[in-house]
Structure formats: structure tokens, C-alpha cells
From Swiss-Prot:
Pfam families, alphabetized: cpSF2-GREB1 (PF20692), GREB1_2nd (PF20688), GREB1_C (PF20267), GREB1_N (PF15782), TAGT (PF20691)
Keywords recorded for this protein, A-Z: Developmental protein, Membrane, Transmembrane, Transmembrane helix
UniProt feature, compositional bias: Low complexity: 237-253, 1158-1171, 1212-1248
Family note: Belongs to the GREB1 family.
Organism (species): Danio rerio (Zebrafish)
Name of this chain's protein: GREB1-like protein
Entry's Gene Ontology BP terms: kidney development; morphogenesis of an epithelium; pronephros development
Polar residues bias spans: 338-362, 1172-1202
Acidic residues bias: start-end ranges: 81-90
Biased composition (Basic and acidic residues): 1127-1155
Amino acid sequence: MGNSYAGQLKSARFEEALHNSIEASLRSSGGDPQPVFTQLYLEPDQYSGHVEDIKPKMDLSLRSDPSTHVLVKCHSSNSVEDMDDEDDSDTSSPPLPYLQGPPPDGCCTVDGFCQAGKDLRLVSMATESIEVPAGFELVGAKSPSIPEHILVCAVDKRFLPDENGKNALLGFSGNCVGCGEKGFRYFTEFSNHINLKLSTQPKKQKHLKYYLVKNSQGALCKGALICWKDCKTRPFSNSASSSKPSSSSSLSSKENGDTNGHSPSPFPLSDSPPARMQSGSSSGIFGPQELGFLKPLNTPTHGTKTLPIVPTALRVNGLTNGLSMDGRSTLLSPPRTNPLSTPSHGYRTTETGDSPASTAMSTGPPKKRHRSWHPTTLVPIPATAVPVPAIRPLTCSSGPLLSLSNQQPASVSGVIQPQPITAGETVIIPDNLLNSYGVRPVLLIGQGTLPYFFGNVGDLVVSPLLVSCYKGRELNEKTLASLGMSANQLLTTETMILLTLQYLARLGTEQIPLREEFEQIMLKAMLCGPTGPPVSPAQLPWLARMEASVSGGSVQVLVTHGSLGEGISESLRSLSETSPQQQQCLPNYVLIICTSKSGANEFCVLVLGKYQSRALAESMLSTNEFLKEISYELITGKVSVLASHFQSTSLGDNMDKQLVRYQRKRKDRVVQPFQGHLTEYIHSQEAATMIPESGPDLLSDDFQIHPPQLSVARSLLSQVCAIADSGSQSLDLGRFCKVDFLILVPPSHVLVHQTVQRIRQSGVLIDLGIEDVSLAMQKSDKYVVRLDTEVHTKMEAFMRKVKQNPYTLFVLIHDNSHVDLTSALSGSVCHGELQGLADRVVNCPEVLEAINLLVLQVSCFPFTLQSRQSRISTQNEVHWPDTENQQGEASPKDLIYFGLKDYSKSLQWGVASPILRCDDAFERMVKTLLERHPHLHSMVIRSYLLIQQYTEALMALTAAPSLRDHVTPQTLAMVEDLLSVPGRSKHGCGHMLLVRVPSLQLARLAQERLEEARDKLGLQYRFAVLLGSPAAEISLPVHFCARLRAWRGCKNEEWVPHTYEDLEGLPCIVILTGKDPLGETFPRSLKYCDLRLIDSSYLTRTALEQEVGLACSYVTRRVIPKTKTATSREERPREGERSSGETAEHDDLPMELERPPSNASAATRTSGSTTENGVSSSSILDKPSSQSDPCGSRTMMDSCSSPVRFKQECDSQAPSSSSTSSFSSASSSSSSSSSPAAQRPSQSTQAPRECNRTQVFPRTAVLSRAAYTLLAPETLGHPSSASLLPHADVSWSSPLRPPVPHGLGGAEQSLYYRQWTTARQHHADYEGPVPHPHPRRLLLSGPPQVGKTGAYLQFLRILFRMLIRLLEVDVYDEEELEEDVQDKSKVPPSSGPQWPDVEDVRKLRFDLCPHDCKFKYSSPVYANRMPKTQSGVKTERLDTEADPPKRNTVSVRLSLFAAHNAFHHCEQCHHYSEPIPAAQLSDCTFHAFTFCSSMLGEEVQLHFIIPKSKESHFVFSQQGSHLESMRLPLLSDKESGMMKSPIFTPTTGRQEHGLLNIYHAMEGAEHLHILVVKQYEMPLYRKYWPNHILLVLPAMFNNSGVGAARFMIKELSYHNLELERNRQEEQGVKRQDVWPFIVMMDDSCVLWNAQQPGPDGKTEVMNVSLKSVLQHMEATPKISQYAVCGLRKWSSSLSSQAPTSPFSRCHLHDLILLNVDLTQNVQYDLNRFTCEEVDFNLRANSSGLLLCRFNQFSIMKKHIPIGGHKDFLIKPKLMRIETPVRVCASQYVCAPDSEQTLLAAPAQFLLEKFLQSCSHRLFPLALSNSANPVLSIDSYLNLGPEVQVCYVSSRPHSVNVDHQGVIFSGLLLYLCDSFVVSSLLKKFNFLKGATLCVICQDRSSLRQTIVRLELEDEWQFRLRDEFQTANCSEDRPLYFLTGRHI
């Protein structure tokens, strides 16, 4: 209940209450403790101080001779937090919120408001009328989050103290005055409701501060303080310091949820409702305590809950079972504050004069259901726990040293029963271990029961580092199977002990145990299996000692027989008794083995080595925790001794005095800023005004994207398309016409400026069309948002845009997304950083649910995004191509990426000065200082030493050469480079030196000290010292800004650098601070990365590698030794990447030439999406893609980018141009390359004016020993950084797992981490949707500084281009073949009437030859007067064995009136394309329609599928079941907007791609649209077009061509016309008044245009709707006299041509208005596959019918490569081999009954294809002979473009061409009917040797036709001239006979 205070209970009343409480708990049905003690009042009387007044139930077991008691003074239980001071929170470090359960969904969480959203602040409630129930009072509560406000609460008076601080009932009862909710019985519940957001456990004493009263004006105001205790009589401990942060007595650790500053979530114990407590959990750890001992507890083994913070005396018994599998260490230190407050995880030492017990008792027990403690209480300590023998192996004895045996405590739900404590299991930690011996021992948990620890617990650290390695028996069968093991391969305890010894023995003196390394040892041992008989418990001691003997004394074995506590106690006692001289002989590790009589061995490891114990303890702290610890040490002055040490130089002189002396000596003179030696001084005023010449030659300002970036961008685009095509309907690309974006970056000002600069340089805002050219530069910053406190406002605005623009595809790019992945529920202010913001933004419901929003997370260390709970699908990951595989073919001059792997491999180069270095001299200094200052964190010591090293190096190089020998050579070399290089150049360019100092306080200290030393030494104009803090802008002195401006030729005096790249060439030291590097790019002048502060605190892969990632860059290929490149070439064939093919394509191009920007439209035609290098789509104007200056006056960008830098479009720095010794030529340009080889730098590289380019060398990284060991090659025997835990926010999902395979690509690594890691509780993905990742989220991963920003900006660009392409369509753009010029003079002018005159049209001559370009390779039709181009002969021939010729297309933008395919979706026409649920398919009705076809000579049955909504277009029988007819309007109907003609669309194979959605084309008007489909395709069309009427052809037409569909449409339409005439005639309508027209339209008609005369004499073309076109034609006067009306085909040349006649008589196709009445006797050839329209038009014309084309209208046809009436795949009927064999055209026919391979294709199709390609063999005399065409009776067949056909109809009274005087070269009789007679044929003249070809259905018909037509009289036949199509008999082949004219 947590409401106790300074008053004390009488012991008798307390015991009675305790008894009642336990009894109530035991009797209750639930396992939770019941709220009791409300009958007790606290009495503040001074306690008597006698131990006898405390009556513990176990005192009898502890009572012995009083002389053996050790009396210890205990401090007051009233900790600092109980003081009345309002500001009683810790001032040295920001508090962590007291972690409660998450608030209910949808509730208000704003400070000052209750969860119902009502304002509780006193300033708002002061004048409100508040109803206060009887017995309640208004009080004011203070919230740590808003200290300036008081919250108004109503509390029951009974639970408030009186004026004396007495008589307050324990517990709580309160009401919310905001929303009126009543009955809060627990203060925890109430504090949650009013959003107190506490940093400690909720206590009414701490947070209810004031009574509230009304003033004279009646306003509510603050009254008197609530007197919770009698402050006058309460003594305070002298050792209690208010400046101390919360104690470290926590079981929290990184492995138990306490990472990155997240303290474990303690179970609610105070004022908490029982329902919130975990039954059977460790919440009972704060049960009744007796004499300072905590009872043993059993912790549940599930390991998913974080452990609570433990009180003073700790039993770690349950710890071994309660930790998570890979639990990290537990840090124990003396608790000086409330045990439930947040631990700082620092090292707390006992103050002078404190006894061990006083340290242990300073806090007292938790204040709930416990006996009160008093500062004067004397507590006895059992004598049996004190005398411990020295460290030595214990020999076998008759029994345990202590008579009491181990007892496992019984845990009672919620309340732990008081039990006697076994004295033998108690370990007293000696005093002052850390102070006296410089060691804080670390206890590595093994197996077994650990003892109670009592005394100076702050000097012992309990770590579960290796405990997961011993949990092999907990593996399930599935995990064992994945490891290739079975249960019988698990190791015994004895084997694990021996393996532990072997591992510890081989560790170096500067190595610490690594869990991942030891886990692999254990796994290998299991896989290898036992090599001999198992080790018995009796053999274990001597085998263990033998194993330890090889360690040289670093490992010792201690064997006990009672308990592990004996061995631990003995080891600690021995340590405390060791003299300082003997400390060097202490072992580093003591393995304690307990061999009990039961035969079960227990063991643990005590780490006593000074380095090892310290490194292990520090590695347990998360980054936030150790930064907080450093802050504490700096604030409290613990570093004063260390600081005083460094006030002197290494020679013993006072450093400050020495610097002052040097300053006075030089007076006002300073070292010359540049172009001068360090010994050359000038006056300071002159130095301040020295401006260098303009920098080295400027590079061109072109912006380029390089092949790897383009490859990645395309991969991202492909993945987006895959999401859209996945069928999950999570992304519909067809609805978007724009792209917008927002980039989220970590809270770094420099990173924001850097990203904004990339956006400006890339021109992406202009390319996306979201900003004007004039405003794009100024508005770029709107698209980049820092994840800080202002992100919510900007995200709200962004999400409003997302909701308001549903047809814009938004992309939310989360750059460097691995930096903060803390859950918003556990996010907190830690070390000044607000965490959880990314989770609130990226994972908020609005973002997850927005269907027009893509989330792209970008990371160079994506491991934490790839756990089992990842929100990103593995398919949605895009990984950077492997750089090694792209380097084999590149030129030595090219720049190649040099990354983390390359740094590790560089150690094999064998060079004298490696680029990856460890400063051994510095490490030796650090080791000495660490031993002198054991209380301080090692980073503090390293930082102070580093500052001194740089200071002394500056002094040694200028004024004190004697200090040279005291500075490490590495430091001296870096500083010498920094100082000397500017002096060698007239420009003053120099190096950048990057020093990484994670702690902000230490970084500021370093900046101050180095600036002070620099200025006093006169170097303030030589180099700059900058603090690189994420929270601040770059601050640079004025004279350095002037130097940068001079280099850039920048005239803007207000310009200052905003990014680190802007510091290009500036000699400077950048002290980079902050918890993590945030992705900032550094200039190529960065030469050194000093990472010597990155040590054993960075033991996760991400933490370590992101630090070394600062050094990664692009380097010149030739500077890399051949070992690297040779390896690359060897590995290249083995591992192929998707972009490897781009290398050879450009190998021969010159390396020094710039590639011109490519034309965007050309790129669109080739790649369909993007330009290659000229990334800006503005390059379609053939302009360079360089960005222009909006002011028109700058050379570079307005940011004054460096003249010698690469123009960068990505997150990579321009590679360092500085080599180890080559910067003496500072004016030379950096290496650049415009080669398009596959491996390109991520920067845009431009060719400099000079050709002698400086080589770009890798940067030098100087590491600590710990980091160097992990990054060195594994040949050194150490694990690599890749084997570490990938990130602190995830944990291993299994104690054992296979090792991380070497050389894994990004995808394989992702799969590994997804299988073997799981998110921790505070991770944003902790409750992620494992089975269903977010469908619209992608991950882009790539190495640091490789160019990811440029890649995703290019992705945005090509995504937009693709969306535009989706709104564009490729239409055929072909000019008509030459028309008959002689007729053009006779046509009316273009300004003629809108509609044709029937008589005028009759006067026009029908143009027999088809002019559409799709008939380019068809036979020309002979006419009386041939066009000029056709009077000659066509020479082209279509080779059917080759691919069909590509027709010209052009991309046009879809208009509002376009027809669409099934992928189109919009709100207006969704009923056209969106599939309906299966349950609604029954809404469609099936109807059979039967009629008799005179052409077929039999009845035909068609099937209609009619949706319910379309039934109004049909007439059904009275019963409603029989379809009678389709309704037709009347010719006289004048209703506006009415469409009279039903539209038939024959379609096949295009259920998705056919343009069957004509809703927009018809302007949404009512119309009748019928799809004519084959029977086997009906289900597919029904699925995609459920609301369309389907006309299903009979099954006999499944293999027929389009001619059959057109034939059936016309036959059905005429039969329906007759039915409608009969039906309407009964209603009094004349038969001739029924509308006789139908529309027959192809499924590829997309747009319609109308031509109008333009002002300049040219015609203007505008888009119109299909509705307007049809209505115009339907309104034609005397329309019933026209047989067919149609449109012309569009081409781009129409607008430029001179106006022609408005109407023509010619061939019509694609879209026709057909009069089925007039054309009753003119049929489509149902057998035809091709040219059926030409054949029909010739028949209709020969019948004397009118065909009229409206030339003012044109139709655009989309190029659809899929489906349609395309060629069949001709293949052999029986395939003997799998590989398809191409069949040549001559094999389409064969001799009857031959053995030739028969083909699986329709006979008619084979015939048409044969005639098309082989007619030159059939009719050799007609070849290229237009004067002697081939005579074709009643049919038009395509005989190829070289053979001309003369069409003649055999029908009586037909209109035929005048053939008088024409001698024909051949005769073609195709399925001729009875109208063809011998007398007709005798009218025609043929050349001698002319060819006859007679084609019939079968052989008998063929012979009968020969006889009937008397062909043998004039034609000679041979038996071998008979052929058939190459079909088998069941496929009904066609037969034909050829003959020669006699």
C-alpha cells in the first residue's frame, strides 16, 4: 500500500496486523494480497532503540552468546525522497518515469489532464465550482513532468494526516474532480488516472503536497503544506546525501529489459489493485523482512518479465531461474534511496565512516506491510556468517562446515512466509573491497543456488552473463533439430564446468568472457559429442584443478561441499586479507564448485581480476546508463582526484601555468594561419584578416546517380510493384498520380541540413512536381523532420495531407531508423534524450492504416529491425549490392567503397602504418590509471587522458619539445598532421581530426581544454576546435567562416557552414558527442577517426560497428593492395549480385569523360521508368541536370558548397582526398571519376579541370584495445563483431544457436536474425505482428556512408515516373499508307458539314486498298487506278519465322474519357472493375438464347450472363425465366444523352488488360455493353468484370479466331432485330422504326479525338468521349441508309497534315457502327483469324452498300502485348522433347497422308499463315507484279505484301472492279460456294503458267469442285500438287490443290 511514513508501529500491534494480513491472504481465493492495515494508525513516537522490542519469529535460531553479536548502526529508513522539500527528486540525473502498465487505448495522456481529457491544473480549476463530497478535502498534487503546475484532487480526510502529522489511515481513497470518476482505492491507480507520470513508486506522501483553499475572491489557491510527518523529531542520517542519484541496487540490466536507459518495470506494490499483480511472480520479493534479510524467492522461469529492484539484503537464489535466456548482469550496490526508485547503475562506494551494515541499512525496507525500521536500531549479525577461512581448496570433510542444510523456501502467493534463514547460506561481503583493494568482484552465475548477500553489497556485482550457456537442457526439440542435435548430446554439469575452465584459462590478460564466444564453444562440444567416458562427480575436482593449472595462475578452482556460499565467502575473505603486495598474485577468475552428497554439482565463477571485473561490470550498463553514471561522477566531484592529477604535465609542471607562460612569451603574436611553419609568428590582427586565395579548381556542379544507387532504387521500385501485385489489395498503384514524401531523421541539426542539401542538389522536388523551380531551394527544409519534441506537430500536418490527397502516394522515409526503436509505451527522458518518438510516429495507427502511404525505413545497421517480431516482411527488404563483386572489372582510377569488412581485412596488408590501429602506449597509460582510480568509469579516465595527450601534443609541437616523449606516437602524428599541412599551402587547406566522445559533459570539457591550450599556444588561427553535438548547430569562429567562403568564392557574407561537409579542407578537430553517431557525413578532408574511448561498453554489433562506420568512405581503387582486389575477383564469380551485369556494359568508355545527361523520354522508352545518370526528369528538354542558382550569381549552391568537393546526392561523404603523406599538394583536386563502371562512389563525381588527380586514401581509425580485438580478423583467434548480439534492444531467442556464417549477404543475415533474435519488452516491435508484417513497409539497408540517401531520392523519382507511366498509355502512332491522291480534289473541303450527305457519299469511289498500317504486310487490293506507291511493287516480305515487326508506338497521357483495364480503380467507376464477394455472384443470371443460323444451317445456342442491374436491357417471358430479346430503341427517339446502339466487344485472353471499362469514355451515361467471350474463358471474365453482361460463344468456337466472334455478334444482332421488330410491331411501332445498328469495338480502343480547324491553318486535335463520338454518328441524317460507319486511326501527324475531306468511303475497322439490317446478306467469315474486317468490307462494298468514315474523329488504340486475337503457339502435336522447337512456315502444310510432323494448331490458322509467308512459291508469276494480280473469288486472303489480289464477287448484281484487259497471274478459290460457276471463271484471262489454288474442307469436296467448275479444261493438275494443312484427321485439316494454266 506504500503509505507508511516516519511514524512507527508498536511491535505488538504490528505483529497482530501482520498475522491478520497473512491469514487474510491465505484464506482468499486469489493469489494476491488483500488491502489490510486500515485499522492501524502510525505513531511517530521515538523508538526505544532496543532490539528486544522487535520480536521476529526467527530470533531463536539466531540467538547465541551476546558476545558473538556484531552490532551495526542502521541509518534512518526515511530516505531523501521522504523529505518535505518539493524539489526532492534527484538533481544529478534526470529521473526515469515509474513504469506502469500502458494506459487504455484512446485515453488522454497529456500532462495536467486526466485520462478522460479533463483539465486538472489549478490555474484552470481555480474559478470552477467543484463539488466536494462529505468527508473529502481538495488537495494539490505535484507531477514531476509539469513542476510548475498543481493538480487538483479530492481525497478522503481519513487518509490525510492531522496538523501533527498523525492519525492518517494507511491506504487511499480519492475522486477525480475533472471527469467525476469516484472510488479510487489505490494511489497507484489514481496517479495513473490523473497522468502523474511519476519517476518513482507512487506515494501519496510524496505527491500530495498542499491543501487547497479559497481566497477572498473565491478562487481556489494553494494552502498549507500537508504535514505527513513530524520533521522536528525525525533524525537524519549524516551520510544521506541529497545529491546522490538513485541507488544501483537493482537487478535490472540490459538483458532484462533495462537497455538504453529503460529501468525494469517494477511490479506495482504500493497502493496497487491486486488485479495488477502477477500471481506467483517476484512481486512478493518485498514481503516481510526480518533483521535485514530478504527471504528466498522463486522467480518464474518464463523470463519475459523484468525483475524488480531488490532491497538491501539480497538472496539471489531465484535469480538463476528468473533471468531471461541471455540475461545480462545484475549490478548490486548499496541502496541509499527507495528501492523502487530508478537505479543509476553506477558504482556507489561506502562513505568514510560508514560500516557495512550502515551502508546496507541506509534505506530500510520497502514501506509496505513491513516492520518499521529506526535509525537507532541495533541489528545482530549471525556469528556463523563471519569467520570464513582463507581461499584454498576444501578437502573432503565429514560434512558441511555449517550444520544447517540448504532449504528451498516455499513461496506463498503474494506473501512470503517468514522462514528461518540458514546461516550457512549467508555471505557477508567485506568492507571496502573497492576502496582498499581496487576490485569490485563480479559473480558469474553458473548452476545452483546462490546464497544471501549481506553487508557491503555495493562492492559485488552479480552477472548472469554466461548463465544462458548452461541452459542447453531447456532447448526444445525443434531448436535442437535446427542445430543438428538430439537430446542425448546435451552436456553434463561436469563437462560444462571443465569447458568453462578451459575457456577462462585461454583468455588473455586484457580479455573478458564473451557470452557469444562461449556459447559457440558449448555448441561445438555438443555437436562433437563425448570423446570419452563421462566425468564422474568424484573425478571433477582433480580434473578441474588440472585444467586450471595451464592458466599460469590466472584461474583457480575452489571446491566446497556445503554450498556455493562457502566458496564465495572464503574467496571474498581471502581477497580482503590479501596485502597490497600480494594483490598482483591474485587469480583473475575463481571457479567455485560445490560437490554435495546428492551428487549434483553446483558452480559459479568469481571474477577478481581488476581489469576483468571492471570491464564486465561496465559492459553490463547500457549506453544511457553509463552516460548517466559519467554525469553523476562529474556532477558530484568524484573526478576531482583525477582532475587534479591531470593539472600537471607529464613532466610534473603545472599545465595551466606553463600555458600562461607560453602565452606571455609570444605576446600578441600568433602562429601564421597557413603557408608558414609553426615557428613563424605574425600579429594576431594580421592573422585574423588573412584570406587565402580561392580554393583548388572548382569541380563541375552536375548531379549524378551511380549504377549501384540506380540498382537499389530500381529494386525498391520492383518491391513496391510486387506489393501492388501481391493480391493483398494493400497497395493500388493505379489510383495515384503524384508522389510526395517526408524524411524523418534522428534529432541532429547537422543531419537535417545535410539531408535538405541532398534534396536541393538532386532536384527531386522539381522532378516530382511538388515545388516550383523558384521555390524548391527555399522549401526543401519542409520535407525533413527531426525526431524531437516538434515532430508531432509536423507529422499531424503531414498526415492531414495524406488524408486530404487520396490520389497522391506518400512515402514516409525513416532514415537511420536503427537509432531509436524504443516503444512509445516505455519511452522516457534518458540522459537528455527523448525516446520512443520514432515508434509514436512510424507505428501510429494513422500511418499503419493509410492506404496511400508507404513507409521506407533506411538503416546501415538494420539488425534491430530484423527480429522475430519485425514489422517488415523479408520480401520487402532491399539490400545494397555487395561491393566486392563489383570491383573486379573497374578501372584502378575508380573510387570503390571501403567499409567495415575492408578495415578488418586491411590488417592483412602487412603495411607499416595500418589504417586500423590500436594505440598500445595509450592503453598502457589507461591501465595504470584504471588501477589508481577504481571508483571512476573507465571512459572518464580515458577522456581525461585523451585531453591531456592532445594538449601535450600541441605543446610538444610548438613550445615544449621535451614533452614529445610523453605523448603517444599516434597522438603526436595526428596532431602534427593537423598543424603542419595548412602551412604547406597557399590555400591553407588541411585535415579534419574526428574525436569521438559520447558523453556531452566530457566533450564540452575536451573542447574547453583544447581551445584553451590552442589559444594560449597561438594556434587559434591555425585550426578550429568544434563540438559536434546533435542538439546544436555548427559554431565556427568568424575568421574560419571567411576562409571557407574564400575557398568557395562565396560573396554572401552571412553564409556559415551547416554541415560537416561544408568544412571541407578546414584544419580542425571535431569532437563528436552524443549517444550514437546519427549518420552525419564528413568531408573527404577527414583523415583520422580517434575512437579510443570506445571500449568494452560497446559490446553489441550495432554499437561497435556504427562507431567504426564513421571512417567508411570511397577510396581510389589503386591505393588498395592487391590482396583485397584479388580476393574480390576470386569471389566475384561465386557470388552474383543483381547489378553485376552493369559492369561489362561500359568497360570500354573513357574514364576521364563526363557522361552527358540522358534524355528522360528516351530512357522511358528503354527502361520504362527512369533516366540513368541525368536523374532529373527536366532533362527531357535535353538540358544538363545541374542545379541552377536561383539568384543567378553563385558559382556553386547557395550553401557555398566546397569547390573541391563532390556534389553529393547521398548520405556518403565525399571520400577523403588526404593520404598519409600526400596532402602537401593541398591545391590538387580530389580524385573523381565519371566512369560508369558498376562500382561507383555514392557521391556525384565530376571531372576536375586538372588531370593529375590526388589519390583518395582510406581514413585512419584509432581504436581501443577492446574494439580493435573485435574488429581484427578472426585469424587472431578472437570472435568478430559480427558474432556479438546485434543490438541492445533485442535478445537471442535461444541459449544456443549456430554461429553467424561468414560472408553472408544482407538477405541471409536478415533471415538469421529473424530466426534467432527476439525484441525486448521496451522495443517498438515487442508486440509486433509476427504472422502479418505491415504490407506497405520496406527496409533499405546498406553500409554506412555508401549512398543510401541518393538511392532513395532516386527511388522517389522513378516511382513518380512509374506512376506517370501508369497514367500514360502506349498507343500506335502510324501514318496511313499512301492514299489515292487523284481522288482528293473531288472531296469537299474540311470546313464541310458535320454529317455526311448520302448522295455525296454515293458519289465517292470506294477505296479498295486498306491503308491502316496494321495491313502493311498484307496483300494490296487491285483497283482500277492504283495509288502511285502501289503502281509499283512492294518489296518487303514478312518473315514469319522471325519475330513480328515492332509497330511504332508513342506514350500519351490518359484523359478523362479514356477506357481502362481491370487495374484501374476510382470512386466513380469501382462498380466496373472491383470484384464482388462470392456470395453476390448469384446476382448474375444465366440465360440461353437459341436461334437458327442460315449460314451454319443449324440452330445455335448462345449463353448470356446478365447481372441483376442490367436486366432492364432485356425482355423476358412472363415467367421471367426465358430470355426473349434485347431491347432496341427507335430511330425516332430523340432523348438527349441516350445511347441507342448496344456495344459488343469481342475479347479473349485479356480479362485483366483489356480496356473493358468504358465508364469514363461514356461519361458515366447509361449504355449497354456486352463482352463476347469464349466458353472456357467465361469464369475469368466473370471474376474480373462481374458487373458486365457476358455473351458466351458455343464451345465449338473455343479454338476459332476473331472472325467467329464477329460472325456470331452479327447473326445474333440480326435475329434480335427481327424479334424486336415483331415485339414492337405488336405495340404499334413500324418495323422500319426499330434501331438496326450495333457498335462493334475492339478491346484495345483507349482514346477518341476530334479534329477542329486551327487558327494557323492546321487542325487541332482534342480528346473527346466515346459517348460524344457515337452520339454524333447516331445523329447522322438518313443513317439507316448506311451499312457501316467508322472512324479513322489516329497518328501524331494528323495535326500537322492539311485538312482532308470530312468523309470517306474506305475500309473501316477497330470501331464500327454496323447496320445489321442492310448487311443481312453480308457475313463475316467465321473461319478467319486475320484480315476478317478487310474481307467483310470488300463483300459489303461489292454488294453496293455504303461505308462511310468520319474523318474528323480518330481513335487511339493501345498497344497491349498480352492476349487478344494473337498468333497461336504452333508446336508439334506430340512433343518428344521438352524444349519447344520452332516450326517454319513451310511445315504448316504437307502432302496428304504423309509422315510429316503434325501440328497442334487450327487448320484455318495454319492455312492463313502459310499463304501469308509462302505465297511467293504458290504464285511465282504474281510476285512483285502489280499488273498481273491474283484473282480471288468471294474472299480476301492475305498472300503477303509482294502479291497483289484482285477481289471479285460472284454474287449477281455485285459491284466489282473493272477487270477488262487484266491478265491474272493466278486464281484463288477459297471454300467457294454455288455462286461460283465455270462460266464465271471463263470471263477472266490468265497468263500462261499462272497458278491455280483451290481450297476446300475435305478431299472429296476438293475433287467435286474441280469437276463442277471444269477446271481440268484450262488447268493442269498433278497428284503431287495436292496438299493439306499439317493437322491430324480429328482436327479436320483443310485441303488444297494447285495447278498450272495451260
